């Protein structure tokens, strides 16, 4: 739920002159953010049916990228990352398109010198902060060269 909230807020900020007017909803605090994200094509309608337990489960790194991918549309490529060059993400994996797009746009660079992504690990707050800042501030994006 927290990832959806951040994604919805980023989307609104980028499309509303830097302003975020979203507020906690009901019956759950995250209801308004999920509705906004679905209504604006950020995430799929299936998230509306998630239980509170599902919404409060830590998000995996691959799903986090998927949730944030829909928050904006400017993913100008600054890196050349060939298909299947991320060591633990092949192009047929779930959310691979979004992950490769983030690498190519300089939003992600990998967790080691090989560019390993660790798609099924829980995302850390520090990683969330890096992704958010690179999405919002294009000058913060990083170059990466995968072997």
Predicted regions and their residues:
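Feature responds to low-complexity, polar/acidic, surface-exposed segments characteristic
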Residues: 1-62, 70-96, 108-122, 134-147
